[in-house]
């Protein structure tokens, strides 16, 4: 006995499989992102499409860093995201709280002018900046 599915049902099944694949890949990409630091040198590991890639850069190669997302609840960060632009044209996004705090801490220690520029671009009052300072003081590498 043969069962024939109508064309819309087949299209719907393939669409659901595609959506599930995208969701799984998004979670894999997020979990695979990693930022490591040693004396101002960074290695950012990420998955682009299917292939794992790495970007090596020094803190002095950072041209600009833009705070793209911040969500604060009960005096601490829940979410913080940065877009980082390098001198050689590369750009990438830090989406994990610990990686963003690591980058900010190295900026505060090694490149104070970049750190002050990042803080000046935050469209908020001093309470957000004081929360950032407190989080950085409590952050351990």
Question: What residue spans do the PLM features occupy?
Answer:
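Short, surface-exposed polybasic-and-hydrophobic patches located at secondary-structure transitions
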Residues: 75-96
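Alpha-helical transmembrane spans
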Residues: 1-31
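Phosphoinositide-dependent membrane-docking surfaces
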Residues: 54-72
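Alpha-helical membrane-targeting segments
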Residues: 47-51, 71-77
């Amino acid at each position: 006995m043969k069962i024939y599915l109508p064309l819309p049902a087949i299209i719907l099944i393939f669409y659901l499989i595609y959506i599930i694949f995208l969701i799984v890949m998004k979670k894999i990409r997020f979990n695979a992102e990693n930022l490591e630091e040693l004396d101002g040198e960074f290695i950012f590991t990420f998955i682009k499409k299917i292939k794992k890639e790495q970007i090596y850069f020094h803190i002095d190669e950072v041209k600009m860093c833009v705070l793209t997302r911040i969500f604060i609840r009960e005096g601490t960060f829940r979410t913080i995201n940065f877009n980082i632009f390098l001198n050689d044209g590369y750009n990438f996004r830090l989406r994990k709280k610990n990686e963003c705090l690591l980058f900010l801490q190295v900026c505060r220690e090694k490149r104070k002018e970049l750190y002050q520029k990042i803080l000046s671009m935050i469209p908020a009052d001093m309470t957000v900046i004081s929360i950032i300072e407190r989080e950085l003081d409590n952050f351990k590498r």
